Amino acid sequence: MFSTHHVSRLLIPLLFFFLFCCFSSTFAQDDITNPVEVRALRVIKESLNDPVHRLRNWKHGDPCNSNWTGVVCFNSTLDDGYLHVSELQLFSMNLSGNLSPELGRLSRLTILSFMWNKITGSIPKEIGNIKSLELLLLNGNLLNGNLPEELGFLPNLDRIQIDENRISGPLPKSFANLNKTKHFHMNNNSISGQIPPELGSLPSIVHILLDNNNLSGYLPPELSNMPRLLILQLDNNHFDGTTIPQSYGNMSKLLKMSLRNCSLQGPVPDLSSIPNLGYLDLSQNQLNGSIPAGKLSDSITTIDLSNNSLTGTIPTNFSGLPRLQKLSLANNALSGSIPSRIWQERELNSTESIIVDLRNNGFSNISGRSDLRPNVTVWLQGNPLCSDGNLLRLCGPITEEDINQGSTNSNTTICSDCPPPYEFSPEPLRRCFCAAPLLVGYRLKSPGFSDFVPYRSEFEQYITSGLSLNLYQLRLDSFQWQKGPRLRMYLKFFPVFGSNANNSFIFNRSEVRRIRGMFTGWNIRDEDLFGPYELMNFTLLDVYRDVFPSASPSGLSNGAVAGIVLGSVAAAVTLTAIIALIIMRKRMRGYSAVARRKRSSKASLKIEGVKSFTYAELALATDNFNSSTQIGQGGYGKVYKGTLGSGTVVAIKRAQEGSLQGEKEFLTEIELLSRLHHRNLVSLLGFCDEEGEQMLVYEYMENGTLRDNISVKLKEPLDFAMRLRIALGSAKGILYLHTEANPPIFHRDIKASNILLDSRFTAKVADFGLSRLAPVPDMEGISPQHVSTVVKGTPGYLDPEYFLTHQLTDKSDVYSLGVVLLELFTGMQPITHGKNIVREINIAYESGSILSTVDKRMSSVPDECLEKFATLALRCCREETDARPSMAEVVRELEIIWELMPESHVAKTADLSETMTHPSSSSNSSIMKHHYTSMDVSGSDLVSGVAPSVAPR
């Protein structure tokens, strides 16, 4: 046995040996970063708030030698003998604070990226000192103030992206000096004043995106002098009374012209001389006169001239356009015949479709055949020809299933599940090959089409060839149209089997860095059809945690570390077991201290009204999240049925990769949900935020979803009184979200599968949260009465006005609930075999046969109640938002119908809720009626049984 004295005698010389190695390696360390840039980086960090500690390794060591997060350096020293920072990539790190003027001291910088953070304040003029800068990427922040004149003196700038901020003031005339700039993205700000005519002299510009600003004055004819301009996008500005210059018809390279809602007047210019024009949107202006007769390019996919004051007839040149996807001439004063050749002569394959929107004009007839193929949609509502009963199918309201708004891969397989975070690779030669993908959020900022499906295969080839990957390494998980229109995508890239000698299931480090660098450096070539893209996020799963290693706490450079390793080889030979044991015991004590601190931190987290569960508690409740306990899956993640130690049965929502939030955002959402209490909302019982997991614990609903209870043939199907009770409860829950939650919440995804039923068949609305808050005015100047965002709805339930306005309101929830009411009335699904429930029931109502659509499984009910119920449902589903009732009116009318129900039906409903579930206390029918009605919906009944913890707004 070694005594303490013997151990000390061994440790002392060993300590001196290690110190010698450290000092020796320090003198032999690598080249260091320019001291001016080191000081600048430290000041830059001090000006930022870093709540998730992404920049924690900026405290130690040398930026270039110690792998500082987001810092990329040149590979060798420059003429001053120092290393220099070449890129500062701090995108999507949840940073806030201000941009420091010290950025101007990074004199050799080529890429400056703070995209998708929460940076406030103004843009430092000192950035204009970085003459080497090629990419200035500040989009997706909260920056304000004017654009500095100094930015116009960056001679090497290729791309300037300051979109989606709060920038105001004019465009500096100095921008006319940006002779190398190709991409000019300033959209979604509050930039005002005249577009400088001097910009027309820029020789390299290919994309001008200035939409959603406050620009005014006139449209400079000089813009037509740009020799390489491909995209001109100026939507939603205020060029009061100005006309579109005829010279814009001479933009020979132009692919897309979008001047929607710009207060433009005068005639539509003749654009027939633009050989490759693919997208034209001049809608929502005050253009007048007739549509030019010149034939547009065969490349055209979209023509939108709706909401103007155009007169005359549809020109014959709109027929025979081989790539046309959308023609919208709605809300004009056009007349005459509609040439059916527009859609009859369009050759369509199985992936292609065409939409022709001619609503609200003066068309009197259709020339040619009026029959439609399955992938052709024609809207004629509001024209004189709709008086012809044979055209009723073309004159109904718009429904969203006619428009391609998104897609998700099914990814079905006969293989057993991959262990998280691995997924089945799409590699064709290796079935059931599990691999860890790279997750990329990607957005096309100005696509040249209206329907993505026909171009999906072409896009997949474009992106994989640009990244030098095989086509099968990409899975386009889903895509969604956003306001703009812009196209958001969720991409997954998989490694090739056997490509990584150490681990076939993941990309090697160099490949991850290469792919990431291609995206962050905008090194994927532009494709005319897809337009400019932007990187929304690049997510690395935990298995890739070593790809971008953090600096060691010691702050030693790579050379120093190498010296220590080499010098320590000899020491390792003499290291005894007792010393190893001592070191291990010290480490164990250190780990225990860290674990205690973590437990203490979590234990101190208290949110009133909900419990903070440990990961172990929820794993135990679900048999370690056994697949046998899974009861559902949604956009947030998988849902498990669990039994807590107390015996309480709960539903546990476990966030999947892509749904995880920052800790602050997650806890903010928990705090909001904990304050929502109503008997018709699913109650949040607790949460878990540890072990890299985020989970929500809800009360368990024994009778599942309303969708299940309508579609499944129960021994005793739900009768009308029970369905009416469910409808009333659902409406009250939604009304609470609209009027009593603080801030108010628009649900945005009301559907039968989001209405759950407890043991007594009480309806409880589920799946609401922070992502659905009624908004305050944002950077686009949108009013606080609606949400403008990625559509969250479900086909069949989504407000049709969304496809015109890209806005969701409280009336959008009314529309969705109306669809649910129609489901309750008919037993049908929203969309079945291409038939839309709203359209079908409207047709039946107009023909006087509404009662023929009643679900035959229900017992007889007074016709008066059924007709009032159906009429209310159809009012909720009116195409025009203003024509729909408010949610408060819906509740009142449902209560009136409930009062009209015979006592025998109400009593039977009470009995049904008893016999179909666990025994509970009885109540007579009069009590049942009183319990579910209250003519003053703003009073006690709305919040009866509700803890008054949310103050009215």
UniProtKB/Swiss-Prot annotation:
Predominant localisation class: membrane
Ranges occupied by LRR repeats: 85-106, 107-130, 132-155, 156-177, 180-203, 204-226, 228-251, 253-275, 276-298, 299-322, 323-345, 352-373, 374-395, 845-868
GO cellular component terms attached to this protein's record: plasma membrane
Cellular compartments annotated: Membrane
Listed GO MF terms: ATP binding; protein serine kinase activity; protein serine/threonine kinase activity
Name recorded for this polypeptide: Probable LRR receptor-like serine/threonine-protein kinase At1g06840
SMART domains per UniProt: S_TKc
Limits of the Protein kinase domain: 625-897
Record-linked PROSITE patterns: PROTEIN_KINASE_ATP, PROTEIN_KINASE_DOM, PROTEIN_KINASE_ST
Annotated active site: 749
Catalysis performed (reactions): L-seryl-[protein] + ATP = O-phospho-L-seryl-[protein] + ADP + H(+); L-threonyl-[protein] + ATP = O-phospho-L-threonyl-[protein] + ADP + H(+)
Binding-site positions, ATP: 631-639, 653
Membrane-traversing stretches: 564-584
Residue intervals on the Cytoplasmic side: 585-953
Extracellular side: 29-563
